[in-house]
Curated annotation (Swiss-Prot):
Gene Ontology terms for molecular function: adenosylhomocysteinase activity
Entry's localization field: Cytoplasm
Task of the protein: May play a key role in the regulation of the intracellular concentration of adenosylhomocysteine.
Gene from which this protein is expressed: ahcY
GO CC annotation, single: cytosol
Protein species of origin: Variovorax paradoxus (strain S110)
Residues binding substrate, per UniProt: 65, 144, 204, 234, 238
Involved pathway(s): Amino-acid biosynthesis; L-homocysteine biosynthesis; L-homocysteine from S-adenosyl-L-homocysteine: step 1/1
Pfam family, one: AdoHcyase
UniProt keywords, alphabetically: Cytoplasm, Hydrolase, NAD, One-carbon metabolism
The protein's name in its UniProt record: Adenosylhomocysteinase
Gene3D superfamilies: Adenosylhomocysteinase-like, NAD(P)-binding Rossmann-like Domain
Manner of cofactor binding, per the entry note: Binds 1 NAD(+) per subunit.
Length: 479
């Protein structure tokens, strides 16, 4: 029997991908995705002549998927130059990365890359020009989870005081700190120079927005930020409807498990938790929810879910899903109490929602990529998906193209806003997109789903005190 040879990854100063021969396959899927992403395609049509992003140098840190490829090429169609890396070591679709690389875009993303490679690649997306030149670094960041933004802030602090890198609290922090030290050893002002021309950042996720808000509150945020996550057409669509479809897809691809009849415990009942709970219930699981917020807990109860604690669910549930964006949601004591063959996964953001570090000392057996059996001292095994990272992207292909069109339309519009109107946004502050732009994103997607919009009469508009063309709701309205 002949051995199966894996292709050698391609790595240069302007790309690191798994296999360039996958480019044709990736391009075919990109073409299909474009037909399912009406928001991005409409933005291309509207703005391609005006080139509002001409001169923009965008550092992109976001899952390198087929849908992201459509986003990248939309930004380029509007005049931007981009350098791209994935924001998760398991989320890259190698054929998407290959297609983008083949088109000449600098991209650094390999599914299953090491953490060292991850931070090397995140550094690489800031290298736009020669040292000391105008345009050496980016003038915009497009971020997902905040790692690119974090790197610039932490690196600048380390330039002044290496002591900030002295006490890593996790393996990932240890590797990040080592990467920063290595960069500073050869170039002591690298982070300051790369940040010098950054106008602002647009952030995709709840986790990244939390980081931005924290820095803004402390007065340490170096540039302007737009919180894309809290656009209604992102959080109420991507977070809810996207997770509703991609969670069970990831679990099914990984395990082939029958979900009907199982007890599934969803940690968190925000938008991601709501979508996850709906998906599991649609497949006839008994869904339990854990919550810290009494309002969300009451919402879950009113939807018919049993609201419990993780301590209660640990030895009873069959499937566990974390959706919170917090840390240590499933701890060692919870996993130690679980049933044999319990499935544990995360669709929040970082892998610390599940205390994976506490079970690294046990015996691990890889069933297939991103599916591991972990044997506890008593002989019981649990099935951990994507090593605690995002299950929908680690074990599946992420959200469908249509819902990502809505999210990425927000990202593109936010990039245009910050780049073309920097004086309208104060450095160090975090903003959301104006309501009329949120409504615009929704309008761009109505035709695709066959939706007809009713138009107000002049009398009706006057009666409720709004313009016939919107915005239709106050900023305080909760959709």
């Amino acid at each position: 029997m002949s051995a199966v040879l894996k292709p050698t990854p391609v790595s240069t100063a302007d790309q690191a991908i798994a296999d360039l021969s996958l480019a044709a396959w990736g391009r075919k899927e990109i073409k299909i995705a474009e037909t399912e992403m009406p928001g991005l395609m409409a933005i291309r049509e509207e703005f391609s002549k005006a080139q509002p992003l001409k001169g923009a140098r965008i550092t992109g840190s976001l899952h390198m998927t087929i849908q992201t490829a459509v986003l990248i090429e939309t930004l380029q169609a509007l005049g931007a130059t981009v350098r791209w890396a994935s924001c998760n070591i398991f989320s890259t679709q190698d054929h998407a990365a290959a297609a983008i690389a083949a088109a000449g875009t600098p991209v650094f993303a390999i599914k299953g890359e090491s953490l060292k490679d991850y931070w090397d690649y995140t550094h690489a997306i800031f290298d736009f020009g020669p040292k000391g030149s105008q345009g050496e670094g980016p003038n915009m960041i497009l971020d997902d989870g905040g790692d690119a933004t974090l790197l610039m802030h932490l690196g600048q602090r380390a330039e002044k005081d290496l002591g900030v890198l002295s006490k890593p609290t996790s393996e990932e922090e240890r590797i990040l700190y080592a990467a920063i030290k290595a960069k500073l050893a050869v170039d002591p002002t690298w982070y300051t120079r790369k940040s010098a021309e950054i106008i602002g950042v647009t952030e995709e996720t709840t986790t990244g927005v939390h980081r931005l808000n924290e820095m803004s509150a402390k007065g340490t945020l170096l540039f302007r930020a737009i919180n894309v996550n809290d656009s209604v057409t992102k959080s109420k669509f991507d977070n809810l409807y996207g997770c509703r479809e991609s969670l069970v897809d990831g679990i099914k691809r990984a395990t082939d498990v029958m979900i009907a009849g199982k007890v599934a415990c969803v940690a968190g009942y925000g938008d991601v938790g709501k979508g996850s709970a709906q998906a599991l219930r649609a497949l006839s699981a008994q869904v339990w929810v854990t919550e810290i917020d009494p309002i969300n807990a009451l919402q879950a109860a009113m939807e018919g879910y049993k609201v419990v604690t993780m301590e209660y669910a640990a030895d009873k549930a069959d499937i566990f899903v974390t959706t919170t964006g917090n840390r240590d949601v499933i701890r060692h004591e919870h996993m130690a109490a679980m049933k044999d063959q319990a499935i544990v996964c995360n669709i929040g953001h970082f892998d610390n929602e599940i205390d994976v570090a506490s079970i690294e000392k046990y015996e691990w057996e890889e069933i297939k990529p991103q599916v591991d059996h972990i044997t506890f001292p008593d002989g019981k095994k649990i099935i951990l998906l994507a090593k605690g990272r995002l299950v929908n992207l680690g074990c599946g292909t992420g959200h469908p193209s249509f819902v990502m069109s809505s999210s990425f339309a927000n990202q593109t519009i936010a990039q245009i806003e910050l780049f073309t109107k920097p004086d309208a946004y104060q450095a160090g502050k975090v903003y959301v997109l104006p309501k009329h732009l949120d409504e615009k994103v929704a309008r761009l997607h109505l035709k695709k789903v066959g939706a007809m919009l009713t138009e107000l009469t002049d009398e009706q508009a006057a009666y409720i005190g709004v313009s016939k063309n919107g915005p239709y709701k106050p900023d305080t309205y909760r959709y």
